[in-house]
Amino acid sequence: MPELPEVEVVRRGVARWVVGRTVSSARFLHPRVTRRHVAGPDDAGARTRGLVVADAVRRGKYLWLPLATPDGRAEEAMVVHLGMSGQLLVEAADAPEEKHLRAVWTFDDGGEDLRFVDQRTFGGIAVVPLVATPDGGPGGLGETPDGSWSGSMPAPVAHIARDPLDPAFDDAVFARRLRERTTGLKRALLDQTLVSGVGNIYADEALWRAKLHYARPTRSVTPAQAAALLAGLREVMTAALDAGGTSFDSLYVNVNGASGYFDRSLAVYGQEGRPCPRCGALVRRDAFMNRSSFSCPVCQPVPRSPHW
């Protein structure tokens, strides 16, 4: 599933090619694409037609497009769930349809279409109300911080925490809330109500950078270690963004269909049996929450009282 860097790559592409354009039509080609929009596909289409895509905003792994009236007011947004394999692509109107095309939006300027392609159909869209953010800050990272919608976010996303690349992220609050938990460190990182945007790949990479074992009890994490962990998250996510994200297959692409290449720079994730780039010990893989955790047995020793 795409994590923060992959979604941010898509957000930037949508911001460049779609923001500021007026939707003229919406066509949904698979019933699952609007399953999160309770009123159905016809209603989803009607609530976008004639409105301007005012911005492309991201918080963690969540992406939404505020929909504004001609006077600039945005009371709703289209939330895009990429799921396991969702892709937002900008294509010429006469380009051949992709095999797994699920939705198409056209615009009144007659330019390129926005297409949603999803092989596994776990993704989808929903048009939902915007609500004020719980902390009064910006909803997420967008292109127009002074827009009328900037202090709001989609109602279904309101419980999601800020992500480490969000300028409004509070490091001290994160460290305090982390120590209040009674769980393992990686489990906490995957909890989107504590910190958003972190999935299996970047959790493993950040823990390696901070020299912390994934099963370390959160209550034992010192402020200095929490700071090192956040630094690791920001470092690996920024590097992944520069590389266009991590692509292990053709499913994670930007709006022009190009895959990222950060998978070539991973230190431990997916590197079982290969030498740790820091100490040379062989990277190990452990079963973890129906997935895998990768770590260095020397740089990231198992704590005395692990919380598996």
UniProtKB/Swiss-Prot annotation:
The keyword Nucleotide-binding does not apply. DNA binds at H100, R120, R181. Binds 1 zinc ion per subunit. Its EC number is 3.2.2.23, 4.2.99.18. InterPro entries: DNA_glyclase/AP_lyase_DNA-bd, Formamido-pyr_DNA_Glyclase, FPG_cat, MutM-like_N-ter, Ribosomal_uS13-like_H2TH, Znf_DNA_glyclase/AP_lyase, Znf_FPG/IleRS. One of its GO terms (molecular function) is damaged DNA binding. It catalyses: Hydrolysis of DNA containing ring-opened 7-methylguanine residues, releasing 2,6-diamino-4-hydroxy-5-(N-methyl)formamidopyrimidine; 2'-deoxyribonucleotide-(2'-deoxyribose 5'-phosphate)-2'-deoxyribonucleotide-DNA = a 3'-end 2'-deoxyribonucleotide-(2,3-dehydro-2,3-deoxyribose 5'-phosphate)-DNA + a 5'-end 5'-phospho-2'-deoxyribonucleoside-DNA + H(+). It holds the Pfam family H2TH. Keywords: DNA damage, DNA repair, DNA-binding, Glycosidase, Hydrolase, Lyase, Metal-binding, Multifunctional enzyme, Zinc, Zinc-finger. Involved in base excision repair of DNA damaged by oxidation or by mutagenic agents. Acts as a DNA glycosylase that recognizes and removes damaged bases. Has a preference for oxidized purines, such as 7,8-dihydro-8-oxoguanine (8-oxoG). Has AP (apurinic/apyrimidinic) lyase activity and introduces nicks in the DNA strand. Cleaves the DNA backbone by beta-delta elimination to generate a single-strand break at the site of the removed base with both 3'- and 5'-phosphates. HAMAP family: Fapy_DNA_glycosyl. Monomer. Belongs to the FPG family. This is Formamidopyrimidine-DNA glycosylase. It comes from Kineococcus radiotolerans (strain ATCC BAA-149 / DSM 14245 / SRS30216).
